[in-house]
Amino acid sequence: HDFSPHKSDNVAMVEYDLQNRVSKEWLPAVMNAHGAFQSTESVQSASRSSNHDVCPYVSKFYESNPLSRETAIYGAGGNWYANSKSLNYVYLTNSGIGGDLTCKRYRVSDGGDSFSQDGFYAEGELDVVKTIDEDGHIKYDFKNLYGDIVLQRTVGNENHDTYYLYDYRGNLCFVLSPKASSQLGNATNIGVDNNSIVANLSFFYKYDSKNRCIEKKLPGCEPVYYVYDMYHLPIFSQDGNQRAKGQWAFTAYDRLGRVA
C-alpha cells in the first residue's frame, strides 16, 4: 500500500484451483488502488501492463490423484508458454542393480567418523523424483523412508552422483561429491583420517551425544571445531588457521540467547 513516491500500490495475486492448490502466481503490478480491494480481472490486466508480457505468471500443474504432487511448472513470461518450455517432475521408485535408478547403500559407523558401502538399495526401497528442466537436462533425487535425500544424480554423457550419508540417528555425516563417489569404488571403513579421496573431495560432520555438530570439515580444508554451553549454544569455534596459533573464536550471548 502506497509503496512508491507516487503513492501507488504494489499488488500481487495468487490463483487457486478447486482443490485449493496454487495454480497461478502473478508477478506484482503497480496500481493506483490506495489499499482498496481490486478484482481479479483488474489485477491481471495491471500485471500484464506493468510487466509488458501476456503471461506474467507462474503456472503449476498437478497429478490427478489424491497425492496432488506437482508435475509441471511454467515460469513467468510468454516465451516459456509459446515454446512449451516447462520444469517437469516424474515420480518413481529406485531399481535394483543397473541403470539410472540404482543407488548404492552406505553404512556410517556408530562413531560417525567412517563408512562402508553395503551393496545397493533394494528395488522400490527409495522414492525417486525425476526432474526435467526447460532445456531437457535430467536430475534424479533419491529419498529414503524418512524423507532424507541419499543421492542426487545429474544425467549427462556421464552420471554425476552426490551421495548423502547419515548415521543411525539421522544426522548427516558425509557428503560425497561426484568425483569422490566415482573414485571410491567398494568403500570399507574409510573416513577423512584414512582416505585422501574422502579428505579432499567430501564434506564431513561429526556430532556429540546430543546431536550437536562438534566438527565440520570441508573438502581440502582443516576441520572446524565447535564447543557448546549448557544451553546448546555454540560459544567456541576453531578453524585450521586458529588452531596453528592456539586461538579460538568466542561468541557471547545475552540472557535471551541473542548474540551480544
Could you describe each region identified by the protein language model?
Residues 1-260:
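Beta-strand elements of repeat-based all-beta scaffolds
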